[in-house]
Amino acid sequence: MSMQDPIADMLTRIRNGQAANKVSVKMPSAKLKVAIAKLLKEEGYIADYAVADEAKPELEITLKYFQGQPVVETIQRVSRPGLRIYKGKNELPKVMGGLGVAIVSTSKGLMTDRAARLAGMGGEVICYVA
């Protein structure tokens, strides 16, 4: 059976991996997943990521901890295949009062809510991370 929501699966693997204090998590790779992992690394929520070039490419995310606690407090899917959530530039949410980030898919690619506001763009809200 095929996966209905690969992004939700990725976020769940990260959440479960940190709950179990794993060093890293592996999942099937896709361009959108790699773009999300890149943003998470830039924002400091994960330590690193790598794509293994094989017959079936695999994305490995190295999780990040601070004083034994997971850096990612919450990671939540917002827009999903059954209910897409789009927000304009003035409607983009501030996650945890600006302490977290919302990952937004815009016409210029994936970016954080802060970057989208600076660029004056709205888009599909993929997930919240705090």
Swiss-Prot record:
InterPro entries (UniProt xref): Ribosomal_uS8 (IPR000630), Ribosomal_uS8_CS (IPR047863), Ribosomal_uS8_sf (IPR035987)
Keyword annotations of the record: Ribonucleoprotein, Ribosomal protein, RNA-binding, rRNA-binding
HAMAP family named among the record's database cross-references: Ribosomal_uS8_B (MF_01302_B)
Protein name, as recorded: Small ribosomal subunit protein uS8
Purpose of the protein: One of the primary rRNA binding proteins, it binds directly to 16S rRNA central domain where it helps coordinate assembly of the platform of the 30S subunit.
Record note on quaternary structure: Part of the 30S ribosomal subunit. Contacts proteins S5 and S12.
Pfam families named in the record: Ribosomal_S8 (PF00410)
GO CC annotations, alphabetized: ribonucleoprotein complex; ribosome
Domain of life: Bacteria
Gene3D superfamilies: 3.30.1370.30, 3.30.1490.10
Protein's UniProt keywords contain GTP-binding: no
GO biological process, one term: translation
Family under the similarity heading: Belongs to the universal ribosomal protein uS8 family.
Gene Ontology MF terms: rRNA binding; structural constituent of ribosome
